[in-house]
Amino acid sequence: MSRHKVYKAISSYVIIAIIIIAIVAVVGVLLLTRHPSSSSVTSTTTPTTSSSVSPSSSGPVIVYVAGAYKAIFDYLAKQFEQQTGITVDVVPGGSFGLAAQIAKGQPVSVFVPVAYIQAVELEGNRDPGWAIAFISDQMAIIYSNYTTQSPYWNQLYSNYTMAMKTNESQYWYNFFYLLTTKFSLGISNPSSDPEGLYAYLILKMAGYLYANHSFDYFINLVNHNPNVVSAPTTADFVPDLATGKLDFTFSYVSYAISQHLEYLKLPPWLSFGYYPNETSWDSFFFYKITVNGQTLKIYGNPVYLYITIPVNASNEQGAIEFVEFIVDHVQELSMFGVTPITHPLLFYQNKSDVPSQILNLLNQGVLQYGGNFSAV
């Protein structure tokens, strides 16, 4: 074979080899583009947003809590984060208003309404069907040192002290009459905030007891007092109380303590504290509220703080751990002026709705069964 032919054959083989290498390289690039490595997926994937709520096992634990108890949950969140490393975001507001937000699909892990278990049912299709009552509180009439400078303060306070000492109806009548006509008074919206609902129930009780069984007597006085103001939550009144622009509001004892405000304690039959002898009396009174276009007749009951996990909760596993943590640390909360329930009460509509971890606490005797929602 001549040198020219050999050279031509070698050249042909080289060209074929180059073509094969090029084809392999192109195919390899295409495969890498279509099938990135697992480490590439982890580093480049970003969460997508959706209008529907779906459960998640990561991210912070988002706690929707009745606004008066924000200080308690700021404390619990810090302790929980230190113990588990899981971040907790505390979102305060009126219980009924928060329930409405949850029903509309807002992301939330844990819901902590106060006073009325109906707030759990107002979550709509995210109602989990269960809740735990873990502390009790009671209503009081809140004020600041500025209030004591009012020209009617001495008259009001003397009637209050005599009423608490003697329980004579005339002193109580004088007290509530002065409160509702001679002072500026903040009452939160009863359709968004249970504190406002309790305020109107207390006024109905006072009218029935001290104004010839007239349920609406003191409510009518409030409605005709131009110095009575409303707000979505009681927290909205705190700045004006602290600066003397507002004289009084109705709130929980624990909230007054957490805000370093003064308060007038109410007797058991007006405070909605957990007094077993008063529960049937409390439930004799009702007030109508409207939430999401729905009118509800709400009967009086003790001030409980509930905790539950809505359906399709964000970071559901973290939410369960947070609930377990609270049950385990409930006795610590007495420093906030509330009464811990030694064996918190588990309420549910159907046992099958309750997470297995929560049922285990019931079976172990850590929780006690409180009944279905209608029992509250």
From Swiss-Prot:
Organism: Sulfurisphaera tokodaii (strain DSM 16993 / JCM 10545 / NBRC 100140 / 7) (Sulfolobus tokodaii)
Gene3D superfamilies hit by this protein: Periplasmic binding protein-like II (3.40.190.10)
Protein name stated in the entry: Uncharacterized solute-binding protein STK_20340
Top-level taxon: Archaea
GO biological process, one term: molybdate ion transport
Sequence segments annotated as region (Disordered): 37-57
Gene Ontology MF terms in the entry: molybdate ion binding
Signal sequence annotation: 1-31
Family assignment from sequence similarity: Belongs to the bacterial solute-binding protein 1 family. WtpA subfamily.
Keywords: Signal
Keyword Transcription regulation: no
UniProt-listed Pfam families: SBP_bac_11
